Amino acid sequence: MIPQISQAPGVVQLVLNFLQELEQQGFTGDTATSYADRLTMSTDNSIYQLLPDAVVFPRSTADVALIARLAAQERYSSLIFTPRSGGTGTNGQALNQGIIVDMSRHMNRIIEINPEEGWVRVEAGVIKDQLNQYLKPFGYFFAPELSTSNRATLGGMINTDASGQGSLVYGKTSDHVLGVRAVLLGGDILDTQPLPVELAETLGKSNTTIGRIYNTVYQRCRQQRQLIIDNFPKLNRFLTGYDLRHVFNDEMTEFDLTRILTGSEGTLAFITEARLDITRLPKVRRLVNVKYDSFDSALRNAPFMVEARALSVETVDSKVLNLAREDIVWHSVSELITDVPDKEMLGLNIVEFAGDDEALIDERVNALCVRLDELIVSQQAGVIGWQVCRELAGVERIYAMRKKAVGLLGNAKGAAKPIPFAEDTCVPPEHLADYIAEFRALLDSHGLSYGMFGHVDAGVLHVRPALDMCDPQQEILMKQISDDVVALTAKYGGLLWGEHGKGFRAEYSPAFFGEELFAELRKVKAAFDPHNRLNPGKICPPEGLDAPMMKVDAVKRGTFDRQIPIAVRQQWRGAMECNGNGLCFNFDARSPMCPSMKITQNRIHSPKGRATLVREWLRLLADRGVDPLKLEQELPESGVSLRTLIARTRNSWHANKGEYDFSHEVKEAMSGCLACKACSTQCPIKIDVPEFRSRFLQLYHTRYLRPLRDHLVATVESYAPLMARAPKTFNFFINQPLVRKLSEKHIGMVDLPLLSVPSLQQQMAGHRSANMTLEQLESLNAEQKARTVLVVQDPFTSYYDAQVVADFLRLVEKLGFQPVLLPFSPNGKAQHIKGFLNRFAKTAKKTADFLNRMAKLGMPMVGVDPALVLCYRDEYKLALGEERGEFNVLLANEWLASALESQPVATVSGESWYFFGHCTEVTALPGAPAQWAAIFARFGAKLENVSVGCCGMAGTYGHEAKNHKNSLGIYELSWHQAMQRLPRNRCLATGYSCRSQVKRVEGTGVRHPVQALLEIIK
């Protein structure tokens, strides 16, 4: 039995008083003080971990102003505040103690657009890709690019002055910020924009906080103009935080306070809104993917690409390429980056040309390709091949792979993981190759592996050395390397922070700015935040206050993780290896990962949040001397003793009375998971939440009773076959209003599905496919076996959507094969989802033995529901290991593709069909939609893939009363719009859950693709 974890780091009373008074004064946002909420805000995409005291989620600038006014009260003068948005920072920029002010949950509105003048006004929580999706119909985009664009917010980009691919042409975020609305500590609203110097000087004479700010910045930047110009490096990625260089224009006629706030990392004010310059979308985009025999060759050849007038040159090393090959993303780009025969591709330059003149762009591309061919023939520059990508869809897929590179590095095998701490250094591009050669020599001298990729045109390369932060010696080495890289970048006239901001690296600021200029930064900080209450420890302390700075060797996630025994860390790898990349925060409703995060906007309900909580839970167990691996081994095979039952009843009673246990917070996070498994493939690190969720639930319920609904779900495969013998009787009973009311109130289940009428057995009575014995199958000759297909049943389709199975059997017959319906054998997936892992292992072993026996017959086995079929491949393998055997159950599309391989493609005509894939299917098997389309094409039918996210049903998730609202909300995110837009009778869904959700919400259902094929053939 797991122990009660009764104590978690508490919240000081002053913070609680502040939050209470905040709500009393009309704060309309959310506040959170639970340990789980604070833990999810204690990390970002960096190696650091710092626990805040509380989190607030304002809904408007007025809410932020209320926070700032109340904070200025003397009784709360000791509290500190840190703005936060996407949480994708790689250097702890938004990590701090005190109160976190999170803009991402509610402040995500696009307020206004002016296409004629080319600008847009947004709130700080708007995500970069969200904005570009909105701008696309107007023919615009927000130009600064970054790899985390589908979850990084504009507020975060502004606060770190972010930039990435294309910055040589488009510049940094600050180059596109026309003005901001910022809330100062005290509640004053500061609106910035470029001003004539005379007006700025006049504003500085006002005896107000804003007047003091204008006066300080104006006077310091004017008086120290020459010092600033002399000390700021002449780089595309100029020195940020605070950008003293660009406050005045070159002619000294214009003053813009915006440039001080961009890159300020929340140390000066709360930026709540911004007016942004937007750029016309280029009409033509081309990529030339240039392949090299070494990474050094790729680096040294980059200036040649820039000279060819390319928009950007991105580079990727062999380590990143090889990790991409192992990821789901490679499926989408493999044809665009093919291997060169008899050559090893160890480096890649992705060269983009863009513009409005197609003839001119193609001329430049062709000229480059001619030069590349000359280099290949003469064996110069290490060029071994190239490919041109002319289609926009292909261009976007290549960049999606490149964007995923940073996350893929975290999936490197072993305890040492490539980590960010010196990953955005910038040097003049002409020195980049030599600089990287020395950088690599430094890492090689310590025997470290590393991955490299980046923006070689701008002189920025992302270098992530592999270190084990659970090893104290490697943590020391990380600081040593960091110091060495500071010296190395200075040697080449570069910067340590080229695009990701400073964060915990601000301790190096004096070395880059110089003491005299650093003192000027402190004066600016003092004008905005004299008492050091906004994100203290970052950028610089205010003048006149001897405050410490955050350090590179501050407390890290590894500091906590190393308290967990190595064996436990290894066995719970799925939770331990989350590196915080945050891809699970992807805003796009059509992305399968992560539906619970999308609907709640609560990061507790994301793979990263769940992994964070489980890691802390494991640490707290270790702190109490409890070994979860031993507990798992000691679990009884079946049943529990009366003594244990009494103890669980008592513990559950106390829990219902409000007794605290951190395990309850973890349980709450796990209960929101749909177990769709999208994270297990979509996450670059392959964080498999359903797997460690099941293990947690199994251990949690050693202490607490399981709800009745869990037992009902776990035993569905036992009672469904019995109920299917009299489906009308049971449906009548289930349909009674009283039964449904009792089910919702006392069991916690709603909208219970009805059994199929007639049942599958009734439909197939007397049919040869349902009456073949094992002996009859074994007696078939080789030719007969080659034409026989064994259909594997699953509990949901066979008993609740039997027509699909019956139609598949008929389809198999129509295609000239003999279908055989195998006896039903429980799959066990429902047991796995609810954490009945011992019971699941028994079920899996029994069914695996049966299917292995069938496999020996040498006939293909096929199942129709993707989630259940894929369970045989994934969960069975984890539960049984080698005992699983070698059997293989094919999906319907896999078998059809093979069976129809020799059939020619017919002329496609008629109305299109529309394919809606199951989350588990399309993430585990990304080629499934195309495979289905190819199958339809063989019969002259067109099948279009519809890009949607999760439907919200996910097995029994949508039938649980506590999930009902979220289930319907998830459906509304993407499925409902698609169903309203398309003809229902032409929509097809492979998942039983998906079809049942459509029927529940829309009133009429959709069919399985095999049913449409049967109709087409008829």
What are the language-model segments listed below?
Residues 529, 536, 690-1018:
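Iron-sulfur cluster-binding electron-transfer modules in prokaryotic oxidoreductases
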Residues 157-159, 163-250, 254-326, 330, ...:
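Mobile "lid/hinge" segments at catalytic clefts and subdomain interfaces of large enzymes
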Residues 2-5, 203-248, 254, 524, ...:
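Flexible inter-domain linker/hinge segments
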Residues 1-72, 76, 86-118, 147, ...:
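N-terminal flexible segment immediately upstream of the FAD-binding catalytic core
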Residues 88-90, 148-155, 239-247, 314-331, ...:
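A glycine-rich phosphate-binding loop feature that marks nucleotide/adenosyl-phosphate handling sites
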Residues 47-77, 81, 99, 103-148, ...:
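N-terminal glycine-rich flavin-associated loop
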Residues 274, 308-415, 454, 599-600, ...:
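Terminal amphipathic helices with adjacent charged low-complexity linkers/tails
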Residues 548-581, 585-723, 841-847, 885, ...:
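Ferredoxin-type iron-sulfur electron-transfer modules in oxidoreductases and energy-metabolism complexes
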